[in-house]
Design a protein with these regions (language model features):
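PLP-dependent amino-acid enzyme catalytic core
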Residues: 1-505
Length: 505
């Protein structure tokens, strides 16, 4: 069995049942290119969104699964939402542009994007029957939330599989969205316990009615981030750059499923951008072939995802969860915000904007600072990174950390200490510029997960060493768009549906 899902129909009867279900629900699937460039979405479709709240399980919200939502998450934005981290915070001259995943619909995180691409790819090829089968979403939190929301919109049952130790807010959201309490499956451990998730999925997969949509091995995850997140990062950079001579020097991304980092491949091809992969220092899989527990929720470790283009990665950076937990407290507490405004003289609007940054976003920001220092980037060297979700998902984590490490009271003196130790004093330790030999070592580490444990053939595993393999995935987007258009056309013969499915730039 090949682990790459090609853009071709494999089961016409099952596809026909999927078409009947989306016809019944009045669904028109956005093409991948439309999500990359929402300017190509028909005006009639966009106008209907005005009456739909972004967090409702409505079919219209499929069209909001893109980077171009306004700050209120309802309207359309001409440029993806981003904030710029200035030298007064980072201590480096290189501007750091942070894309904001909070603006995505339903889950307030950009992981709904690969969830959509995964299920859409299954539906249009006839690999999934939304009437009789369940969509199983293995995740450390945000991807399974995205999967459950997309499943609900598309009329099928979604099951979340995630570690029991994830934030309370994740589980509270899931409890409101799943069809049945049994559709939340808690596995042992926390963020880095991905193996336990795989084991549960292997058990569930024995039932043919359960279809595993594994983000760590779904190349639709790579493809959608390559085109959508890559395009959004480029657009945000261009908007920030203006008519200056700045260059897109670096792209920084934590490697949870290694989907987001695919945007780096897009940017490297077009701008020569250096790609930096981020992991928790407490679980230094790439840095040291290490292992351990950590609390940078949103990135899973102790293995190399199948969809990580390791041979195109330039730098690996380790960030401690002590730093990210403390930054979550600094920017998310009244005392911290008061310190930043009053003592550091930071703009109040800038300080408030950090509400849009979650724990993994802080990891990416700190890693960007490390990258800028390591590579001696200057004011014309722009680094782009991503805040997957917002601080609102980590209120409970913030409270727990305050109680455990600050005795329940966090004041402006504490805030000053955190600012100094976690931002201005950030060093270039645990930064590894990769040689070809180092890339091969990291690549080979994936063998033990994917070949020995998950049954990927050696041939399929090895194909991923070549950049031509990844270029082939990226170049398949027009074929996927065509499959989606054909699926839509069969689901509805109306002129409106036809124009919605075929509009593109």
């Amino acid at each position: 069995m090949s682990w790459v899902i090609n853009p071709e129909i494999v089961d016409s009867k099952q596809r026909a049942r999927a078409i009947a279900r989306v016809r019944e629900l009045g669904v028109v699937l956005p093409t991948f290119s439309q999500l990359a460039d929402p300017a190509t979405i028909p005006a009639a479709v966009l106008s209907r969104l005005a009456d739909v709240a972004p967090d409702e399980p409505r079919v219209e919200n499929l069209w909001r699964v893109n980077w171009y939502n306004a700050a209120d998450r309802s309207g359309h934005a001409e440029v993806p939402g981003f904030i710029v981290i200035p030298e007064s915070i980072s201590g480096v001259k290189a501007p750091i542009v942070v894309l904001l995943g909070r603006r995505f619909p339903m889950i307030g995180a950009h992981k709904v994007l690969p969830a959509y691409s995964a299920l859409a790819a299954q539906l249009v090829t006839g690999r999934f029957d939304p009437v009789t089968q369940k969509a199983i979403w293995p995740s450390t939190g945000n991807y399974c939330r995205g999967g459950v929301s997309i499943s609900r919109i598309l009329g099928c049952r979604g099951v979340a599989v995630l570690p029991a130790g994830m934030s309370r807010e994740r589980f509270e959201w899931l409890e409101q969205w799943v069809a049945h309490p049994d559709d939340i499956i808690r596995t042992p451990g926390t963020e880095s316990n991905v193996k336990e998730i795989y084991d549960k999925c292997a058990e569930l997969e024995r039932d043919p009615q359960n279809v595993i949509l594994n983000q760590f091995s779904a190349f639709s995850n790579y493809l959608i981030h390559y085109i959508c997140t890559g395009t959004a990062a480029e657009h945000a950079f261009t908007a920030f750059k203006g008519d200056t001579n700045r260059r897109l020097a670096g792209f920084v991304s934590a490697t949870g499923s290694a989907g987001t980092i695919a945007a780096g491949d897009y940017l490297k091809k077009r701008h020569g951008t250096r790609i930096a992969a981020v992991e928790a220092l407490e679980c230094p899989t790439m840095l040291n072939n290490g292992y351990g527990e950590h609390n940078i929720q949103g990135i899973g470790d102790k293995h190399i995802p199948l969809i990580h283009n390791v041979m195109n990665t330039d730098v690996v950076i380790g960030v401690s969860d002590r730093v990210t937990d403390q930054l979550n407290l600094l920017f998310g507490s009244d005392a911290g915000r008061n310190y930043l405004r009053d003592r550091r003289r930071l703009d109040g609007e800038l300080v408030s904007s950090f509400a849009d940054v979650g724990i993994s976003g802080f990891a990416n920001i700190v890693a960007s600072i490390k990258l800028a220092k390591q590579l001696h980037y200057g004011p014309d060297d722009v680094i782009v990174t991503v805040a997957t979700d917002s601080g609102s998902l980590y209120d409970s984590e913030r409270d727990d950390y305050r109680t455990k490490h600050f005795g329940g009271s966090f004041d402006e003196v504490n805030a000053g200490e955190v600012f100094g130790s976690c931002l201005t004093s950030i060093a270039t330790d645990n930064v590894m510029e990769l040689t070809d030999q180092m890339r091969r070592q990291i690549f080979n580490l994936g063998y033990y997960t994917w070949v020995e444990q998950q049954g990927v053939s050696v041939e399929d595993f090895e194909r991923r060493r070549s950049q031509s393999f990844w270029d082939g995935i990226a170049d398949s987007m027009p074929e996927w768009d065509a499959l989606i258009e054909d699926f839509n056309a069969e689901a509805s013969g109306s002129n409106e549906a036809a124009s919605a499915s075929k509009a593109r730039s």
